[in-house]
């Protein structure tokens, strides 16, 4: 009975997401993505803008792939972004970890969410309604506190 309760789609989604994150890390695609983000924001972008971008991208991705895989993908990108500015990477990394833990708005991003969809009879929009306010609170707290707790420079 325990084996029957395991949803193979959840296992495959999680495994595939981890494989994707590892491939992006191994190929150096994380650095390429970081360079593209910095390039799109212009020369010497404000670290606060990068913090917002990292949070938004991490949060968006984590709601459509495993939060563990998203974190594995985004941490090297966040680190590369901070290093490209000569900034302390701690704020960027912590924002990434928090954003990648905000898998509240879909049933996909976290295995626990996926497991209870059928049990609770939830619809996709139920996750969006409950998850977006939680994400908004996390965003505000991160953007306000992290630069204070871990200044970008000095």
Predicted feature residues:
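Flexible hinge motifs at transmembrane-helix junctions and intramembrane kinks/re-entrant loops
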Residues: 1-6, 88-89, 152
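Membrane-embedded alpha-helical segments and adjacent helix-loop junctions characteristic
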Residues: 3-85
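Hydrophobic alpha-helical transmembrane segments
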Residues: 12, 48-53, 93-94, 128-136
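Non-catalytic, surface-exposed connector residues within folded enzymatic/regulatory domains
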Residues: 14, 68, 72, 92, ...
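Alpha-helical transmembrane segments of multi-pass membrane proteins
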Residues: 47-59, 86-105, 149
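Juxtamembrane and boundary regions of transmembrane helices in multi-pass small-molecule transporters
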Residues: 97-154
């Amino acid at each position: 009975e325990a084996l029957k309760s395991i949803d193979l789609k959840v296992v495959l989604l999680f495994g595939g997401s981890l494989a994707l994150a590892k491939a992006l890390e191994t190929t150096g695609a994380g650095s390429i993505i970081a360079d593209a983000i910095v390039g799109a924001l212009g020369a010497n972008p404000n670290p606060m803008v990068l913090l917002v971008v990292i949070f938004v991208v991490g949060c968006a991705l984590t709601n459509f792939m495993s939060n563990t895989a998203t974190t594995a993908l985004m941490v090297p990108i966040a680190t590369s972004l901070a290093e490209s500015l000569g900034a302390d990477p701690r704020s960027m990394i912590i924002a990434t970890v928090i954003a990648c833990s905000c898998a509240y708005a879909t049933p996909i991003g976290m295995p626990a969410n996926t497991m209870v969809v059928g049990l609770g009879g939830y619809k996709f929009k139920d996750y969006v309604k409950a998850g977006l306010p939680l994400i908004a609170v996390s965003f505000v707290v991160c953007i306000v506190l992290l630069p204070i707790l871990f200044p970008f420079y000095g």
